[in-house]
Amino acid sequence: MASSNTYSNFKLATELPAWSKLQKLYDAQGKSLNVKEEFQKDSARYNKYAKTLTNYDGSKILFDFSKNLINDEILATLIELAKEAKVTDLRDAMFAGEHINFTEDRAVYHVALRNRANKPMKVDGVDVAPEVDAVLQHMKEFSEQVRSGEWKGYTGKKITDVVNIGIGGSDLGPVMVTEALKHYAGVLDVHFVSNIDGTHIAEVLKVVDPETTLFLVASKTFTTAETITNANTAKNWFLSKTGNDQSNIAKHFAALSTNETEVAKFGIDTKNMFGFENWVGGRYSVWSAIGLSVALYIGFDNFEAFLKGAEAVDKHFVETPLEDNIPLLGGLLSVWYNNFFGAQTHLVAPFDQYLHRFPAYLQQLSMESNGKSVTRGNVFSTYSTGSILFGEPATNAQHSFFQLVHQGTKLIPSDFILAAQSHNPIENNLHQKMLASNFFAQAEALMVGKDEAQVKSEGATGGLVPHKIFSGNRPTTSILAQKITPAALGSLIAYYEHVTFTEGAIWNINSFDQWGVELGKVLAKVIGKELDNTEKITAHDASTNGLINQFKEWL
């Protein structure tokens, strides 16, 4: 139900008894805990801390938490913290459609988008499942028409290329998913335009044919400045190539939006408008109509498998006891490192080239959600919140920033992701086995390190010795899937969504607004008008004035 901030009575994390207990455990055990020694002391450690998720199709993903800086007492206290922070209460409120995004008075209901069991899911007393299903059915019909060639351009030719124009969640999700599931691609090529930099759309328009290109304009309000500017540029280009006949637009443009008036004004047939509700946040929107480019690219059946994979993790997150709840454990470990070890970053390194955009996607999910300094009690936090998430695919990353991870002065908790089965098992799986050997070796090396005696035994002497020492004891979580399928990818994304949720619930912040993006947009509108004339600018600080005036001189 709609309400004011009903979550302000949730306590600050530092007020919880388990928080103080964890601080004492960190001082007494955590900061000196040696994972290599923990394995020597406890032969069951791996079996205790490795958890397996079974997907809806029977496939599995293994999450190995055993190389983390925890023991049974620390883990039990972290779970105690989750209970005291009422993580499950907030989780249940989210799944019940309550307005847990209280600053915008909205439900947070992206989980309803992957409700393929079609169970009733209500917001403000209204079951949204039929509406979600209707949009999906519309997406299915449209995507199958385009993919089959039944849908034709204005000259009667089949569509060959799809250009998705969006930004933020309307871009990052579809870009990442289409790259990750490229193996499942069909007859269409997809392109993405997001940046207001004219180079982005110019380079795409160079390689597409107006007779065979479908543009998807992805903006819930149909007023997002960057998206509408790019969409108008695409429309002007299209009209200039097609005799300026406005009626041709309907065959080549569709809208992922809810603003019927603006969509119609643009020239798009509102029959080709795919909507989604305000309870779908941008960074959670790939499951919605925003995923139309994905459905066009990989086919609707694969898109539905993607949804079902996420649904399987939702079910696990809701039904599994805290001790075995995989996303909850991932979130608790993040809090442990952030707030007790002082770790500021979180590395996600997929050992899979198809997942090369996965870290960029997770950056928005994590940092836009939990980059907050005000709690649900409307006071500034006195403790650290969101981590700086970064990553690149390995093994490339090993030849760039892994030096810092292994021998730098900062603790960088890391997630490594690998699929056992490659979609491209070339050279009799030679490449895959080399990739896997690095996946296992990097996690092992970060844990065991190399001490002075080992370095000397290898022949190093004098001042060279300390340079070759690896301290080890650097935490990793290894995530091993059977194969990167649509279902597996859906599960991985949902895992990180619920990790992010758990972090925010512990920190007592609203993970579902993003006020931090607003100020820059407001100021940009003011400055944009100043760039339309030749007058010298003096209205800002000296630095901003100087930069604007130099730009105008050089433009």
Swiss-Prot record:
Binding site for D-glucose 6-phosphate: G169, S170, S219, K220, T221, F222, T223, T224, Q364, E368, H399, K521
Keyword Cytoplasm attributed: yes
Highest taxon of source: Eukaryota
Pathway: Carbohydrate degradation; glycolysis; D-glyceraldehyde 3-phosphate and glycerone phosphate from D-glucose: step 2/4
Listed EC numbers: 5.3.1.9
PANTHER family: GLUCOSE-6-PHOSPHATE ISOMERASE
Annotated protein name in UniProt: Glucose-6-phosphate isomerase
Species, as recorded: Candida glabrata (strain ATCC 2001 / BCRC 20586 / JCM 3761 / NBRC 0622 / NRRL Y-65 / CBS 138) (Yeast)
Encoding gene (name): PGI1
